[in-house]
Amino acid sequence: MKTYKQVFSELKRQKKTALIPFFVIGDPDFDTSLAVVKAALDAGADVLELGIPFSDPIADGPTIQKADIRATRSGMSVTKALDFIRRIKDYKDVPIGLLMYYNLVYQYGTEKFFRDFHQAGVNSVLVADLSIDDANEIMGPAVSAGLDTVFMVTPNTRPERMKLIAAKTTGFIYTVSVLGVTGSREDLSDTVAGLVGKLKSLTAVPVCVGFGISKPEHATTVARAGADGVIIGSRVVGLIESNLGDKEGMLAQISTFLAEVRAAI
């Protein structure tokens, strides 16, 4: 199974930045979701961030909330998500991170969840509603299962907490470019470069930037700031929503957009 370290090291040698799209598993249905993720990989995605739909996604804006609703209505479950990930890994071996909420982990059984998903091909699990203060609750079982740890840093994170987060992260640091929930934005925050620079001074762990990246130019700005990866969620999930009646158009638009971002970084 390909690791974050392998992918980020190889891209660094090539002077490239990782393209990391985010999708909700099962949006709008299992088969279409599978085709979408495969199209993203074919367009140049280096790493995947995938969400398991949840009823109360507090960190997400309306675009991803609606994706959660569509996926839930299509019958997506934790068990089906395992099958989905196995199929993706059979298609292409890239690192996969889950971005999700603790209740889903807890209901399934924390140790069993991490073990089963690592065996299916997941490299890390980022629990959006657990802070670094609660990290010990998941770090032990996650590391025991063979998973890397991923934590979030925001523009408001204090330097001492950045150091703590950096020390506990083994996969990559998910750097939130703007305050608030996920969603496409017209302009990227001018604090990104400073935030990436601070983190780079604290850790050798890869630093990836997400939230609000909606254009190839945004991705270029993030890459030039020194980030190791660019995470794009709402923009590509929005292309699913706007093409629900046209699967071929959906796949074509997602492929074109991600290929443009790949070329920009």
Segment roles from a protein language model:
Residues 19-23, 48-50, 96-100, 125-127, ...:
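Hydrophobic faces of well-ordered beta-strands that scaffold small-molecule active sites
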Residues 81, 197-203, 208, 214-265:
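Alpha/beta catalytic cores of nucleotide-metabolism and tRNA/nucleoside-modifying enzymes
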